[in-house]
Each structure stands twice: as C-alpha cells, then as structure tokens.
Amino acid sequence: MTTADISRKRVIPAAVVAVVALIVAVVAMTAGEQRANADSHRYSATDSAAMSMSRPAQPPRGLQPAKLAFHDQMRKLWEDHVTWTRLAIVTFADGSPGFGATAGRLLQNQTDIGDAIKPFYGDAAGNQLTALLHDHITIAVELLQAAKAGDTAALQDASDRWYANANDIADFLAAADPVHWPQATMRAAMKTHLDQTLAEAQDELAGNYAASVADYEEIHHHILEMADLLSNGIMRAFPQDFPN
C-alpha cells in the first residue's frame, strides 16, 4: 500500500463525516424553521381569535347608518332598563345602602325612553310614556317591599296594579301605532317582561342566585326583541326620518 493510498483512505472518512455533519445541520435548521413556523401559526391563530372576540358584534345587515344608530339607541335604552332593574333587585335583596342611588338611575332611564319617542310622537306623548314607566318602577318597588316583608295582601295589590300598568303601557303604544304595534302583541310582550322580572326578583329574594342569573338571561334576550319591535315600528312609520 502506497502513501497515496493511505492518504486517500484517511480523506474518505473525513469527507463522509463532513457530508454527514452538513446533512445533520440542514435537518436541524429545517426542524427549527418548522417549529418556528408552527409557533408563529399558533400565536397568530391565538391573536386572531383574541382579536375576533374583542371585536363588537356585526350590525344587522341592510340597515343604513341612520336606521342602525336608532336601532342601537333603542337597544341601549332597554338594556339599561333591565340592567338597572336587576341591580335594584339585587341591592334591595341585600339591604345595600346603594339601593337608593340605583333606583334613582333606573327612574332616569324611564325618562330617557320617553324622550326617545318625542321626535316622532311629540313631547306630550313622550312625557306620558315616561309617567307610565315611572309607575312601572315605583309599583315594582312596592312589590319588592311586600315580598320581602311577607305581606301577602300588599303583594297581591302591588302585583295587580303592576300588571294593569303594563297593559296601560302596551295600550299607549298600540294607540300610537296600531299597525306596527298591535295591542295583543304589545300586551303579550309586556306580560312576558313582567313575568320574567317577577321570577328574577323572587329567586333573588329567596337566595336562589343561580336561578336569578338564569332569569336575567331570559329577560335580556326578550328585552332586545322588544326593543327591536319598537325601533322597527318607528322606522317603518317615519321613513322620511331615516334616509338611505
């Protein structure tokens, strides 16, 4: 065996080692890139999901800006109605000193709702609706007081007046627009609202807190339907006030 042969035998293993090292390096780089891409995809998907959750719900399709704004305004007013009603029920049941302030804010909401119809039906009609809604709240407070005290007679009296007032509110709206707010429809909507709110109050006073929360979920769903019924009626009755 010559010196050249020995040299060639030494070179070949070195070359193989070099090639293997190169292959290992390439594989390692590829694996690293794949992991990086996977992480990037995962974080990107997570960020996208978070951004999607943070975005507000899409507005109803087909509504022009003026209609959409009014639709949202009416929903906000009635969401405030059930939100402050719930807070009033909870603070009353707990004996919280915050009840008075909460009830005051709830009464302000009734004025806001009455004001919302004034551009269409006039100041007198708006003030009348506010007065009816104020009675709706003050009678509800009497009902809560009677229920907490266990005064059956006072509870029945307040309940009778509360449901009669609900019919008065429904009849007022039906008289304002019998086409879009039929009396039977409005009475049924108001009765459902009262039934649900009464269940919420009874559960809260009895300490059935999970049931009270579930009651509120139903109340919230129903009040949005009612708000849409009201806003749709006004937009159809006064199309000139909602240009495309």
In which residue ranges do the predicted regions lie?
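Immediate post-signal-peptide N-terminus of mature secreted/exported proteins
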Residues: 47-105
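N-terminal export and membrane-targeting signals
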Residues: 2-17
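A cross-kingdom marker for long, charged
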Residues: 37-39, 211-244
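Alpha-helical rod/repeat scaffolding segments in eukaryotic adaptors/tethers
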Residues: 60-67, 91-100, 122-126, 151-155, ...
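Alpha-helical segments in soluble extracytoplasmic regions
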Residues: 85-173, 222-223, 233
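An amphipathic alpha-helical core segment
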Residues: 161-221, 225
